[in-house]
């Protein structure tokens, strides 16, 4: 992920952790090869939605250059207000 995108996620992490619904996004990210099965299992092992959200964002920040655009695309389908929030930061 590019540094400018990491910066956006870092600035918006509190909103993302509070509002993100990670479960519906996991299969989407898996289908796009953004995360692998081990990542999915690890994220799903957490009991709290907020912890799952935090771990997902932290993992995405370490992924390839398409991770940010895949996050925005996934959010546009599931939680468009979060996608708008990220795009406005950029």
Question: What role is predicted for each listed range?
Answer:
Residues 1-15, 21-90:
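Alpha-helical death-domain superfamily interaction modules
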